[in-house]
Amino acid sequence: MNNNQCMRKKLDELRNIARSYNISITGKKKQQLCDEIIDYQKNNPPRRSPSPRRSPSPRRISPECEQWLANKGINPRTGKAIKIGGPTYKKLEMECKEASPKIPSPVRQPSPVHSPVRSPVRQPSPVRFVEKTKGALNKMKKDQLIDFAQSLGLNPGKLLKPALVDLIFVNQKPPRRSPSPRRSPSPRRSPSPRRSPSPRPVFVEKTKGALNKMKKDQLIDLAQSLGLNPGKLLKPALVDLIFVNQKPVEPIRASSSSRSSRSTRRSSSTKPSRRSSSRSRRSSSRSRRSSSRSRRSSSRSRRSSRRSTSRSRSLSKRSIRNISTVGDLEDLVASNLPIAIPESLSRSLSPSRTDFHEAEIELGSDFDLNNLPENRIAELKQLNVLAKQNGFRMINVPLDGNCMFSVIGRAFNTSSSVIRQHTVDYLRRCKGSFDHIPANIDDPTINWNDYIDRLEEDACWGDNTALFAASLALNFQAHILQVAGGDEGSWIRFGVNETNMGRIVNMGYLDNFHYIALEPFSGRLDILSIPSTHSKCPPPEISNRRDEEIRRDEEVEDEVIGERIVREAEVIERELRQEEELTSIVSTKRSLRPSIPPKISTEHRRTPKLRPSVPRPSSIRQSQPNVAALARLETLTKIKDIIDALQRPLENKLSTLTNTEKAIMQCIGVA
């Protein structure tokens, strides 16, 4: 042991060594203990008795090489640390190899003492192979890693330690063993008739969050197990591909043609008569007709149920949806459903239409239809039919995660990175207007700062919020044609206002997959210019409530206002009735006075049965004062003041206002 090796050890280890050498350790520091231990080892070298069974092996290497092999990080000549893999390290390695070539040790023969009756010496059982984690590999030294790589049949070469760890971690598999010659393989047993084969594992569909947590290698294996071709897709595109198409691969069953051939063989073997064959044909044709009718009725019921239960029908009855405010964007993000189209357009897009070809789709060379799944190819062809019906042809952009920004940049004659930067700058400047909208529906823990930072990265997909922000930042309208619900299409327009009526960017959209540029057949549109000034932010005071809740609150407010008006009208009606009763009482009291004074006669005469010429005093009415008319005028002015005060909250509710006016007039008695 030299001084450097001694100083590298801990104080407790040195104290234990000193105790074994009977050296006192009280009050001594590390350097003093090292000096005494080294002196003791020099003066008292360890005595080793030669083994009687083995002759001492000749010394192969020099003491310097022994010290260097014991610790390859220290130069034995100078005692200083050296760099592993450096020039001094390589020089020492070459010297020690030349000075001491490796001599293979002779193989021991079994002892002749054993009798031939006994079984031969057993070889040690092979160590069970255990895959090591990356942390365990990092803790190993480089020499151990090199030996481990060679045992796995790998060529480490001159790789550094991190690359060597990755090489072993990826390729660590147990070596194949040849079958033992002593034991013949046992014959395969026939399956037991009592035990049925174990059922197949139940397929469980995974959510989008669970797919996002998986690694890309796991996603590729899952896609291949589902019969999909992942290709060179990025992780977001791979997640969407698996989420849309995750269905268990069904086993191949006998086709209808094979079944029919079997049935024909059976029928030919039985040889029925002509009458029975004609009857069977008639019954089969009838069954086919009934089955076709049942299929039609079931398809009609499915269509009707879809139309009645689908939320997209309740959202809008039109084929165009405008996204011009933050509230519209909030509804679009919350609904996350396609917009329905008129039935006339859906009839023209019947699924039986197959008269289009791949040559009609004008796509770039990078868009290979063979690498796409079948449902995406069908959706792409359907989008091509929709585009042609609307007077557009499809122009593809690269599938690199920047497709939305590339389509917009094509209209502005610039790159996708410029459009992305304008969008990110606008979102950072106007972040307060979008705070109430969730940044990510699948992962609510992501806040707006993380969302904007991710959106700034290259190959990050753009969503509805990014498209809305880009339309406001660059002052253009984004008209998007998409295939919604199989064979139905719809238009969605982002950023519609009066200032950008001529600045339109048309694009097609494959759901959760790709954006495609649309150009009219008449000619290419003019190239748009990027505005020099910053666009204004949307108003931040827009509430985060849905339109249905706002409409419900307005209806409740209208009902409360109408009830209050009816109560006030009833109070006014009661006052008018009381005033009319008072005026009628006053008028009747004044009319009790007779116009002709009666004559008093002492003689009792029988009254004649003639009708008097003078009318009765009770039937004579004097002219009443016009108090009720004045009261009506006062109440009408009061009602007019009430209507003027309530006119602003009821501007958009003309029907409610007219109904309340009619009720007021009926209560007053004017109508």
UniProtKB/Swiss-Prot annotation:
Coiled-coil stretches: none
GO molecular function, one term: cysteine-type deubiquitinase activity
Domain OTU span(s) in chain numbering: 392-521
Keywords carried by this UniProt record: Hydrolase, Protease, Thiol protease, Ubl conjugation pathway
Composition bias type Pro residues, residue spans: 182-200
SMART domains per UniProt: Rho_N (SM00959)
Known role: Hydrolase that can remove conjugated ubiquitin from proteins and may therefore play an important regulatory role at the level of protein turnover by preventing degradation.
The protein, known as: Putative ubiquitin thioesterase 232R
Protein source organism: Invertebrate iridescent virus 6
